[in-house]
């Protein structure tokens, strides 16, 4: 069960023009596919968020993992840490650069690099042993994983450029009516039982109206959440919490920093309003949890194995959340089926996963998927945990080659929602937050 080779393949997939507080998604988003080849000829796959730095880091590791066991994750982590940890403090974080209100912290190069390797190693070991990846993580506690509909304000267009345009499956949604129509389509096609709206795009009054319209359309039993990506001041966050106290299951990252979130929490509680606050922005590493608990700033943490350091590390996050009576869900970014199935296996082994999981996956066009059989289907908003070896999916080599060729052809590299907003929305677009 030794690793004989590691391949790193950058790929591109079309991305619709989805809006968020920093700006707008570019026509393409890139990912990194990690392949570990075993001594029996089988391959395991992992998927990472693309940045030029992460690509370089993974390439550094690729030449020195030969001979390591697919289950010797401690050795793999030592290799990654030794190669990358020395210069972490000097790097700018390629993701957080879009969110200038987030408190500066060291980039998570080791966590992000190791995560994709760990997933690939679990996939490989599962295939070699004939067991699903979740069994290697302690065994599943649920037979299926439930996801939430993830709504975005959206311009017309399906992503891609030139002669590589995608069909606009969901249409424009830049109004309250458009958001409700988008939600109905997501629920009808996938059966999602809960709904999340990416906010921070329009003045809060309009986004409050959108949440109320969703409540009216879907009734009192469908959980609703909103995430403005820290676009609001503390005062505005309190106002929104007050206005939507009857509608929201939780309020995600209304304002920046742990102290800011703590102040919102205290002021709402003083008014008798107990809306849980969630985050994937002010608590993104273990060292930030103590302050968050002291401040009572966050009641729900959105884990993400891509950023927290892998599947086992995110399992540990779940145990810490349970210790402090915190809820847990999962954060999402634009991703392919490898990451989706890694999320499914992680959710399957995390008892304290108390909320439906976020996913961008419905926004992925069928033609951009690289796993065999095409896009993975949701049934009643759920994906069953596979009993097949590894992650339960295989990579379509031809589709992988096409996605890599697309990456080589396009000019987009590190994600830049802000820069693209200056190109297509307003040349003077500012990413400064809070905006309201």
Where does each model-flagged region fall?
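Structured beta-strand/loop patches that form or line metal/cofactor-binding pockets in enzymes
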Residues: 1-45, 49, 56, 362-370, ...
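Conserved, mostly hydrophobic/aromatic
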Residues: 3, 41, 117, 130, ...
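Flexible C-terminal active-site loop/helix
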Residues: 4-13, 312, 316-320, 335-436
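Metal- or metallocofactor-binding catalytic centers and their adjacent structured scaffolds
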Residues: 37-128, 427-436
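Glycine-rich, aromatic-flanked loop segments that form ligand/cofactor-binding clefts
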Residues: 108, 112, 119-160, 335
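Active-site mouth loops of central-metabolism enzymes
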Residues: 146-180, 228-233, 278-282
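Alpha/beta enzyme core
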Residues: 177-194, 237-249
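Catalytic core of soluble alpha/beta enzymes
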Residues: 197-339
């Amino acid at each position: 069960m030794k690793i004989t080779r590691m391949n790193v393949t950058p790929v591109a997939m079309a991305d619709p023009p989805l809006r968020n507080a920093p700006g707008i998604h570019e026509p393409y988003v890139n990912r990194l596919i990690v392949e570990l080849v075993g001594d029996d000829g089988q391959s395991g796959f992992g998927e990472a968020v693309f940045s030029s730095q992460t690509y370089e880091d993974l390439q550094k590791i690729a030449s020195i993992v030969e001979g390591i066991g697919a289950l010797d994750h401690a050795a793999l982590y030592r290799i990654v840490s030794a190669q990358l940890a020395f210069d972490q403090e000097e790097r700018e974080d390629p993701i957080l650069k879009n969110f200038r209100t987030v408190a500066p912290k060291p980039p998570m190069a080791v966590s992000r690099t190791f995560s994709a390797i760990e997933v690939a190693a679990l996939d490989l070991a599962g295939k070699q042993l004939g067991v699903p990846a979740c069994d290697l993580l302690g065994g599943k506690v649920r037979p299926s994983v439930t996801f939430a509909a993830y709504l975005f304000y959206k311009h017309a267009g399906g992503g891609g450029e030139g002669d590589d345009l995608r069909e606009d499956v969901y249409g424009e949604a830049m109004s309250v009516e458009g958001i409700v129509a988008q939600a109905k389509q997501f629920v009808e096609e996938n059966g999602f039982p809960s709904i999340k709206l990416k906010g921070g795009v329009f003045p809060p009054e309009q986004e409050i109206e959108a949440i109320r319209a969703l409540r009216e359309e879907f009734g009192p039993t469908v959980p609703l959440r909103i995430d403005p990506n820290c676009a609001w001041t503390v005062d505005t966050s309190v106002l929104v919490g007050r206005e939507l106290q009857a509608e929201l299951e939780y309020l995600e990252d209304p304002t920046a920093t742990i102290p800011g979130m703590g102040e919102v929490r205290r002021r709402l509680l003083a008014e008798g309003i107990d809306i849980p606050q969630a985050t994937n922005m002010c608590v993104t590493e273990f060292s930030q949890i103590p302050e968050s608990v002291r401040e009572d700033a966050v009641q729900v943490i959105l884990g993400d194995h891509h950023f927290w350091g892998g599947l086992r590390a995110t399992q540990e996050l779940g145990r810490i959340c349970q210790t402090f009576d915190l809820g847990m869900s999962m954060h999402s970014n634009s991703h392919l089926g490898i990451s989706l199935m890694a999320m499914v296996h992680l959710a399957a082994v995390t008892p304290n996963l108390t909320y439906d999981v976020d996913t961008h996956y419905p926004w992925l066009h069928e033609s951009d998927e690289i796993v065999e059989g095409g896009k993975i289907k949701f049934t009643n908003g759920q994906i069953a945990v596979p009993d097949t070896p590894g992650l339960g999916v295989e990579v379509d080599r031809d589709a992988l080659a096409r996605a890599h060729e697309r990456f080589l052809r396009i000019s987009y590299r590190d994600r830049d929602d802000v820069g693209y907003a200056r190109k297509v929305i307003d040349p003077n677009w500012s990413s400064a937050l809070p905006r309201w």
